[in-house]
Amino acid sequence: MRNFLPTLLLCLASSMLFSCRTIPAPNSPEITSPQEAEQAMQKTYQFLKDAGHYYLATVDKDQPRVRPFGTALIFEDKLYIQTGRRKNVARQLLANGKCEICAMKGDEWIRISGVLVDDNRRAPKVAMLDAHPSLKGMYSPDDDNTMVLYFQPGTVTSTIWSFSHDPIVMRF
């Protein structure tokens, strides 16, 4: 857990610092084509994959909740994450799908905000567990606990921040 602490502190600090900005980042693009949305999703996924772990923030009534995660997958042109249906995070996301993810890689960090949607089909569960085989000891595509969620297209803003370059803002 000690390795998570510096990332968590940086993510929380950047969230507090940059969420107060009232002017948009200079390169805040609108999605103009499906290809641009696909590229933004791929770049976001690759950042999460390279970072190895990220922090998922949800809302529990009036209290924010943050915890480390490590699953990410692009399946059927959507960015997915995975959790256990019996966990508090699942209950929170079913009540309010709005979430934020933060991860750090080198001297950059990414913040992803959007709406997560539950997908109870077997196919994305199989794909997620195949991509993350270490989870197969705890989860199965056929159990009643495995939960996969995807970011609802059109709701996602993904921003790569650094102290050495301007923010890179992507939407998909």
Identify the role of each PLM range.
Residues 22-36, 111-172:
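Charged, gly/pro-rich active-site loop segments
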Residues 51-85, 93, 99-103, 111-113:
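Short beta-strand segments
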Residues 18-19:
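C-terminal motif of bacterial Sec signal peptides marking the signal peptidase cleavage site
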Residues 94-99, 130-134:
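Short, intrinsically disordered, mixed-charge
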Residues 1-8:
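Bacterial N-terminal signal peptides that target proteins for export
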Residues 33, 37-49:
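Short, basic/aromatic recognition patches
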Residues 39-41, 83, 89, 132-134:
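Charged, amphipathic alpha-helical segments
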